[in-house]
Amino acid sequence: ALVHGVLPQAPAVTEVLEDIETLNGMATREELDIVKVSFHALGHFRQSYCLLRSGGALGRGCGPLVVSNRVIKPSDLSQCRVAIPGRMTTAALLVRLFAPQLTDVVEIPFHHIMDAISAGEVDAGVIIHESRFTYPRHGLHEVIDLGQWWESTTGQPIPLGGIAARRDLGTQRLLQIESALRD
């Protein structure tokens, strides 16, 4: 409704459809007034953006998975070359928290990670979105469910992402945006 101008009190917006790491980067460069971001990325631009109260994504049972084309023990992950969907994604943060000794990390757009694993370009990859449901069809095996690991370790839902807005829009404009998102 917001994007299509259906809400009369809402400001006009221009839709930008990109993967989450691209959106994180655009926020880092302050290119957008309102943007969906990874919670992990928010710390990189919190001086310029504030997190809105609406539109956040906290999940249970829907976190990133690490998968491989061969059986890998989770404890051996730090010796592998691992694809991540961007350095500022929550998925990247979770795999680094799980395997802090992991050093061989390759950034690959999320929709190409399974192909990179199948082609042997990486040993494993952190997958997000619908990939977590389709990876068995690609002959891949789960190494670890990072969402399940996070939830069992912390007892908290996975902090996936939220909507951020530029602070320099001013209080009135930010309240208007917040109200439109709630509607």
Segments predicted by a language model, with ranges:
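Conserved beta-strand segments of alpha/beta enzyme cores
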Residues: A12-T14, C50, T103-V106, H141-E142
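Pocket-lining segment of extracytoplasmic ligand-binding domains
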Residues: P109-D183
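Bilobed "Venus flytrap"/periplasmic-binding protein-like clamshell domains
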Residues: A1-Q9, L17, C62-D123, E130
